[in-house]
């Protein structure tokens, strides 16, 4: 049995506008000029970057800054986040082919159900896995191992858009499909690449 594991932001859900608006609203409160959207999206998808320093000039953000960011992000996420074109149909095809379908996101686990239901795709996932005290964020492979163990699958592929995703798949010894319809670009080191949903479906069918 196959399990197809999807990253969320930049792969299934387009949250770029929400992230962009949140970062720049916090910067505005700190009397800093706005940052370019492309810079923000690239920064959040690269492991090891000090985002507080790059976005706000603060080495260690205060609790109030973190809470303010989270509050703003929830607001903008609810307003702006939508599924990428064709992705709902891709999820439906996976279900129709009797593949297990799992979401593995670095977002907090307790925030995932709401956004997936809002976009009418929650019921298309057999398992939804987010970050928590027990489950570390990618590139740690824990989420991917959990997706396999929960579904009992003997073949798995992870679909994402960032280096964090690719490293998680590598750490889990799992094939990785890099998609470039969202935040990501083509990867020279990924197992597979797809520019669009049709290419992704052909790879999922045949891996």
Each model region followed by its residue ranges:
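A short, structured active-site edge motif that brings together acidic residues
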Residues: 40, 122-137
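Short, acidic loop-to-helix structural element flanking the phosphoryl-transfer center
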Residues: 75-103, 109, 113, 138-141
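Glycine-rich phosphate-binding loop signature in dinucleotide/nucleotide-binding domains
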Residues: 96-99, 150-154, 207
């Amino acid at each position: 049995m196959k399990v197809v594991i999807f990253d969320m932001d930049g792969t299934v859900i387009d949250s770029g506008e929400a992230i962009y608006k949140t970062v720049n609203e916090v910067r505005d409160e700190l009397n800093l000029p706005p940052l370019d959207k492309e810079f923000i999206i690239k920064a959040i998808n690269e492991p090891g970057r000090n985002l507080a320093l790059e976005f706000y000039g603060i080495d260690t953000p205060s609790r109030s800054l973190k809470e303010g960011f989270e509050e703003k992000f929830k607001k903008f996420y609810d307003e702006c986040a939508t599924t990428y074109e064709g992705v709902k149909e891709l999820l439906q095809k996976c279900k129709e082919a009797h593949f297990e379908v799992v979401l593995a996101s670095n977002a907090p686990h307790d925030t995932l159900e709401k956004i997936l239901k809002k976009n009418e795709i929650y019921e298309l996932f057999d398992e939804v896995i987010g970050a928590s005290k027990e489950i570390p964020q990618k590139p740690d492979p824990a989420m991917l191992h959990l997706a396999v163990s929960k579904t009992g699958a003997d073949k798995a592929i992870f679909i994402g858009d960032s280096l964090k995703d690719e490293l998680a798949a590598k750490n889990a010894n799992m094939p990785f499909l890099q998609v470039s319809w969202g935040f990501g670009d083509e990867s020279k080191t990924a197992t597979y690449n797809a520019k669009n949903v049709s290419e992704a479906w052909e790879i999922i069918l045949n891996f």
